[in-house]
Amino acid sequence: MQRWINNIWYGSNPIKWLLVPLSGLFWLISSLRRKKFAGSPSASEALGVPVIIVGNITVGGSGKTPMVIYLIELLRRQGYRPGVISRGYGVKIDGVKLVEAQASAVDVGDEPAMIVARTQVPMAVGPDRLAAVSLLQRHYDIDVIISDDGLQHYKLTRDIELVIIDGARRFGNGYLLPAGPLREGLWRLKTIDWLINNGGKAQDNEVLMQLEPKPLLKVKSSQPGLESLDKALPVVAMAGIGNPARFFDSLSGQGYQLKHTLAFDDHQAFDAQALIALAGDLPLIMTEKDAIKCRDFAQDNWWYLPVNARLNADFDKALLARLAPLVQIKP
């Protein structure tokens, strides 16, 4: 299903023309939602803590999670105490809940589980993001909120908006849902603070973000293992993310010999026996987000590829300069 949809959004499938009228309806509904919350006070005024949105205007993965981790580490180096909120996509969450250090992706979602496993940041998940902020404030002394996604969640006031785009696929065919991948029109990019280009050629007013691969780690232990994986050996690669081809290309570019590639839907739950059968006796390499969902049944020869976001120092300075006066505002 995901491949068929991507062919409509990023290819030349003529079915998109049948969906354009529905895109008009989507535009009307989303416009009414925006107007409902227009003129809301900033988060630093309304909540007593500034909110940084890390979102996108397209459906699917664009690199938000590495950017969230990058911001957590950047802010901590400057002495800030960030907390993170998320919807927890792919799972049903009643109310809001804190994400514990060893939280299961089944309970909180794969991205929140990965973020906390990597950073141990205070984090809350749930469909009501304002309630998630309140829960964090009751349990932790935080001075900045990072919202993982939520650009279109206008009920949540915000101070800074970062939009991440896939530098290769960009905006697809340029149509709103369901004819295209856009959650909002391209006009929305004129209202944000920074447009982050993940892995493409940055155009005017775009900040380039590169994902730097790190050494492979064992899915079972998140440790390197006694021996590194020999790149001369054939391997199986799998990815359940928005753009699996990007991951496979990254592995090939590092010299791994991909015998088979397995592309799954984003946020897809995995069956242990099915993956064992698909990989056979070959080493299996997956994304860090997928590893979070597989660690309870991982085999000894299963590995994952961590990546770190890298942005230029000018962006860091500009963001910190924008943030500093907001942290001092109290309701």
Curated annotation (Swiss-Prot):
One of its GO terms (biological process) is lipopolysaccharide core region biosynthetic process. Its EC number is 2.7.1.130. GO terms for molecular function: ATP binding; tetraacyldisaccharide 4'-kinase activity. GO terms for cellular component: plasma membrane. It catalyses: a lipid A disaccharide + ATP = a lipid IVA + ADP + H(+). Transmembrane segments: none annotated. InterPro entries: LpxK, P-loop_NTPase. ATP binds at T58, V59, G60, G61, S62, G63, K64, T65. Pathway: Glycolipid biosynthesis; lipid IV(A) biosynthesis; lipid IV(A) from (3R)-3-hydroxytetradecanoyl-[acyl-carrier-protein] and UDP-N-acetyl-alpha-D-glucosamine: step 6/6. Keywords: ATP-binding, Kinase, Lipid A biosynthesis, Lipid biosynthesis, Lipid metabolism, Nucleotide-binding, Transferase. The keyword Kinase applies. It is an enzyme of class 2 (transferase). Transfers the gamma-phosphate of ATP to the 4'-position of a tetraacyldisaccharide 1-phosphate intermediate (termed DS-1-P) to form tetraacyldisaccharide 1,4'-bis-phosphate (lipid IVA). Belongs to the LpxK family. This is Tetraacyldisaccharide 4'-kinase. It comes from Shewanella denitrificans (strain OS217 / ATCC BAA-1090 / DSM 15013).
